[in-house]
């Protein structure tokens, strides 16, 4: 992935309620990685490092890789506890960024859809396969674009953030294209309900994504050498239903 500043004005440490999210996901993460050997995990597209720090607190060594300088700066600001390493690099070339073998890998938070070409997706997955010990799991989570397109949904839930400068709104819009690509528009708005105008755009960018669906992901994983692939509908032991599930979650080995 090419580093961009699309998310430079968005502090994901603030716009996501991390403690309840991580607590909610832990049961599933433990189910997937509880037997990991070595207890060394790779975090692809680690962002601000919330999952890396959380998993380190559970006794894992975690190496987080991200192409964004801004994200990595915020990851370091959030703290680098023992057992955590953050590296700047292209996740599509992860096998040339990291060293050693891992007992598992995660690619969460809709990171994978920033890979917009199938050949690059395949390159990424093959690179991950090379740095995992035999049989180690790769956990992927992306939005279920099949459902989003079918229902015509073009936005994700808003977040309201209160800080010393006042109140802000984190808005995420989507435009789905016939070829499966997506124009994703994250925006930060300053909200002043007692002023005119009440809303001010702080930042707004169009981010090109590819809304990978289950069949495409399964084919790429198989081609990359992941012999088994189990699909879930969210970060829990819940079956995937194409027209209903919020997410496509995959455990591939």
Residues covered by each model-derived region:
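Class I SAM-dependent methyltransferase SAM/SAH-binding core
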Residues: 52-94
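Class I SAM-dependent methyltransferase "Motif I" SAM/SAH-binding loop
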Residues: 45-49
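A short acidic, Gly/Pro-enriched loop at the edge of an enzyme's catalytic core
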Residues: 96-104
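Conserved class I S-adenosyl-L-methionine
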Residues: 1-39
């Amino acid at each position: 992935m090419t580093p961009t500043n699309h998310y430079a004005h968005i502090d994901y440490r603030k716009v996501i309620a991390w403690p309840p999210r991580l607590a909610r996901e832990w049961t599933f993460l433990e189910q997937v990685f509880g037997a990991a050997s070595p207890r060394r995990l790779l975090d692809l597209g680690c962002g601000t490092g919330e999952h890396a720090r959380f998993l380190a607190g559970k006794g894992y060594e975690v190496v987080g890789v991200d192409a964004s300088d801004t994200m990595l700066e915020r990851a370091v600001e959030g703290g680098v506890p023992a057992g955590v390493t953050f590296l700047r690099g292209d996740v599509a070339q992860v096998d040339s960024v990291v060293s050693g073998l891992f007992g598992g890998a995660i690619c969460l938070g809709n990171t994978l859809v920033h890979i917009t070409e199938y050949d690059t997706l395949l390159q990424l997955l093959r690179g991950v396969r090379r740095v995992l010990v035999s049989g180690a799991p790769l956990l992927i989570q992306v939005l279920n674009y099949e459902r989003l397109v079918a229902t015509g949904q073009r936005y994700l839930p808003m977040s309201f953030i209160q800080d010393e400068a006042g109140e802000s709104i984190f808005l995420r819009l989507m435009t789905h294209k016939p070829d499966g690509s997506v124009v994703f528009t994250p925006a930060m708005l300053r909200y002043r309900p007692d002023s005119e105008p009440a809303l001010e755009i702080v930042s707004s960018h169009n981010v090109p994504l590819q809304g990978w669906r289950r069949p495409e992901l399964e084919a790429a994983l198989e081609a990359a050498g992941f012999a088994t692939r189990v699909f879930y509908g969210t970060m829990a032991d819940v079956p995937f239903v194409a027209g209903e599930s919020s997410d496509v979650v995959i455990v591939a080995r």
